[in-house]
Amino acid sequence: MKTKGKAWQLVLTVLLIAAFVYTAFFGVAVKYGDVTTTYIKGAKDIRFGVDIKGGVNVTFVPSDGYDATDDQLEAAQLVIENRLVALNVTDYELYVDNNSDSLILEFPWQSGETEFDPEAAIEEIGTTAYLTFREGSSADGELVLDGSMVESAAAQYGPVNGSSSEYYVALKFTDEGAKAFGDATTRLYQTGGTISIWLDDENVSTASVNAAITDGSAIITSSASSPFTQEDVVKMARQINSGSLPFALTVDSYSTIRPSLGENSLSAMVLAGVIAFALIMVLMTALYRLPGFLACIALAGQVAATLAFVSGYFPVFESFTLTLPGIAGIILAIGMGVDANVITAERIKEELRSGKSLDGALKSGFARGLTPIIDGNVTIVIVAIVLMGAFGPSDGFFAKALHFVFFAFGPSTAGTIYAFGYTLLTGVLLNFVFGIFATRTMIRGAASIKALRDPRLYGADAPGKTPAEKKQVNFVGLRKRFLTFSACLMAAIVLCAVVLGVHLDTEFTGGAMITLSYENSFEMSAVQKTASEALGSNGLTLQTGENVATGEQTLKISMPGTETVTTDEVQTLLDSLNESCPDNSFAQLSLSNVSAAMGTKFLQKSLVAVVFALVLILAYIAYRFKKIGGLTGGMMAVLALLNDLMVVFGTFVLLRAPLDGNFIAAMLTILGYSINDTVVVYDRIRENRGLLGKKASFEELVNHSVNQSARRTIITTVTTVMALGVMCIVSKLYGLDSIFTFAFPLMMGMLSGVYTSLCVSTSAWVAWSERKNAKKN
């Protein structure tokens, strides 16, 4: 029976994907004179996170342990939003954590901004700005009115009371405020009293009442000894107009990054993505010929669709802030996106080499490849959902769904991890659309064209050529060696951790991280001493690095525990370093502060996320493979996963890299990816059990299934490792340590995943079954 595909299906699908790729990357906009109207958003409209664009991430908490109500937190959120808008900062993300009474704010720096002063922005945004007019000159004088009775405030410059011109703030009261101010000034004028104006605890002005003021207006002037500047009155007017906070705020943690540093990072990650895609395209075409080439077309559509979901291409989906780990998720999805195509292509090749016709091979290959594709990708979806639920905004869908798991920790809102989970989830779900539907439509269409019906184009051997007999590896027979090796490997990793030590990042322990750029070389001991004296800390850790692409050298200074630093203290550090080392030209790149309590919560939440993901994966495997002993198989798969997780952990230890959010993201990704490989093997075992029944022993069944799955598992891992390898190389060249310490351990974990999926999980399952049967006998 001839395939149901039509040639027009191939042509139409290719054209649709090409059009979609073009519009997703470049968008659709029309320019009339100086006005540009955007109809479809493209890659240029993507909102980039602070790690790319530069900006601030800060967490505010009530001062002095104040227990804020939910209504007060919402009121504080509104005030901060008003202040951000007044600062012309509209591309921000602000979340309220009702569990820990905190407000988490992230915003990129303004385009074209040259003076990057995040400390000033944080101070202005977090200032209580409680405006009061009081009788007398004391802060506890009788209240006349407060900021809620001010209708508007405006920064002005001009003569005041007939004197020389100066900067001042002009106030216009509400009706209630006008009456209160009129009554007070009428009374105080008769007694020769004074009125003082206070902003929080600061006395900004005190004046004698020389007349009754009943016109509903007033001005705030400065003292002769400390005149207002233009910046002072503009800032004060903004704060008054945006309203006062219902309680005082303290900065619990914050981090900043220089815009130019992020721009270099973006260039590096885009380059890594292009190279990874090109390498995978060459590999897929070489291995699978026509299906491999068509798979690459579908993969291009998948990448474009991922960008479309991020940029706001689809009006029904809001644009999403893209971070560097988010881009890493897209690149990883490129590698993993070929999985469905590899499974299908391998199945088609098997059917052709078994003697089936092209149409029969396509039909059988598509049918038999669907189940393992679905089962394998579900595990990745589980991991992505856990990432988004644990580290996303509290009002997000997955955060609400998983609130029962993480409620005790509050929404940590680790935007970088959340972005990674989002792009990973989007990529995997789109893999079903493009890797299954689009690829199969194109293959069916190609198979209906006479010139493309040669079975050799789909992986068949040349006519008359006898397929080389595949050598069966006795994986199960070597189980004792495999299990012994895994045990020794994990023991060695534990020993390395004890000897070398495990370093926790300030993200987990709390503290500060300062990143500086410098020129030429220096004596580490001299810089260590100068930095310790400037910052007043003896617990500093210094680490140097280099951006090979830009030639910029970097110095990271870590302060542990409860120690944090301000921008003024960083400036003191820079002055001291440049004074003692004038040839090095030290300059600030970024600053990060995390409270010890917040770091501990983040670590605890991360560990719970890993355990919860393991439980979900075990439950899924137990359910899907219950006919062949799914619970036992699931436990053995989880046991094998420990090997992979230990490899990731060991890589961090050997690199002397601190455990941070990247470590947790890598661990969770390995959970989903490695179990994906194992699930594909288990699916073969289930299929072969149905075909062979009791004709084969469990050991023979497992060994046969592992041999059938080995090629697919290795090839899929090779494509993903290629993508990660490119990320490692490019991140090293550009000095992106955060990306390298994510990609390299992940790559090692995936290589371990091939080994454990083929050699450990199934071997442990057989060993367990033998022991169980021996007890019965």
Describe the predicted segments one by one.
Residues 1-777:
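A structural signal for conserved, well-ordered secondary-structure elements
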